Regions:
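Non-catalytic positions within long, well-ordered alpha-helices that form the structural scaffold/packing
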Residues: 39, 109-110, 163, 215-218
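Short loop/turn motifs at secondary-structure junctions
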Residues: 42, 113, 166, 218-221
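Glycine-rich phosphate-binding active-site loops on the catalytic face of alpha/beta enzymes
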Residues: 45-56, 118-124, 174-177, 218-243
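Basic, often amphipathic N-terminal segments
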Residues: 21-90
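C-terminal helical cap(s) of enzyme catalytic domains, especially alpha/beta-barrels
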Residues: 58-70, 130, 232-251
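Conserved anion-binding
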Residues: 50-55, 59-61, 84-110, 114-210
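Conserved, mostly hydrophobic/aromatic
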Residues: 38, 117, 170, 214, ...
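N-terminal amphipathic/basic-hydrophobic helices that include classical n-h-c signal peptides
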Residues: 1-21
Length: 251
């Protein structure tokens, strides 16, 4: 993401001053109590996993009241603790889905107050359009949809092209062979050939060194990184000291 400021010198001449701010999206957050520490480290978005077969799946409890959506676990815990007014730092919530029906996604969007939908499966551009048309403006003023694009070989980059003007951002999930500083030039070349106008994020087997190389090389469309296993410990919780290595690399 970039912010452009116009500055004026003492002679009245102006020039643009551009600042780049990289965003950090941490996927598969499994506990509410992790959020304050992630917020403190400058994380912009957290991902809640709604893929049922995944070990990080966000469980919910059936409300047993007709069509009323299920309650989220965190809401149940708040009620038990009479803590309905407790404040949690504001970080955008991302819902992670794979080949789900739009209605299922919309239900979880409302229950968990999601700002972004991250699609991991074989969803088509038409599905994204239908989802957004079902939500905006009747249910929410806006909802962002990010589409995951898995990159294993050079032939995979073109898969991003159909999602132009449909997805709000692309997430390029890089094979480990791409996650090296000496591959950044090739990544840049592939992206330039696509001539994308859609913002994008990078994820995969990331390292702080690789992230630093990316930040220095890619275009203003490069919004930031998605972290998950790189900062996850054996208890499936996010390791803050490891996260700090990535935040330093983005500065």
């Amino acid at each position: 993401m970039q912010i452009e400021l116009i500055i004026e010198n003492k002679n009245g001449q102006t020039r643009p001053l551009i600042y780049y701010f990289m965003k950090i999206y941490v996927a598969n957050v499994i506990s509410r109590d992790e959020i304050p520490a992630l917020y403190k480290e400058g994380v912009d978005m957290i991902g809640l996993n709604f893929i049922k077969e995944d070990s990080c799946y966000v469980k919910s409890i059936n409300s047993h009241v007709g069509t009323i959506p299920n309650y989220s676990i965190e809401e149940i815990n708040q009620r038990k603790n009479n803590n309905t007014t407790a404040e949690t730092p504001i970080i955008k919530r991302v819902g992670i889905f794979k080949d789900d029906m739009p209605q299922t996604i919309i239900t979880q969007m409302m229950v968990y107050k999601l700002s972004v939908i991250h699609l991991m499966g074989d969803e088509l551009p038409l599905m994204i359009d239908n989802l957004k048309n079902s939500v905006i403006p009747d249910l929410k003023e806006d909802i962002k949809v990010y589409k995951n694009i898995t990159i294993k070989t050079s032939d995979d980059w073109i898969k991003a092209k159909p999602f132009e003007s449909h997805a709000d951002a692309l997430i390029f999930d890089l094979n480990e062979t791409y996650c090296q500083c000496d591959k950044v030039e090739e990544i840049e070349k592939q992206l330039n050939q696509l001539q994308l106008s859609t913002p994008y994020y990078i994820c995969g087997e990331l390292s702080p060194a690789f992230v630093s190389c990316l930040k220095s090389s890619l275009s203003p469309l490069f919004q930031g990184i998605v972290l998950d296993k790189e900062i996850t410990n054996d208890n499936k919780r996010k390791d803050i000291s490891t996260l700090q290595n990535f935040t330093k690399a983005l500065k």
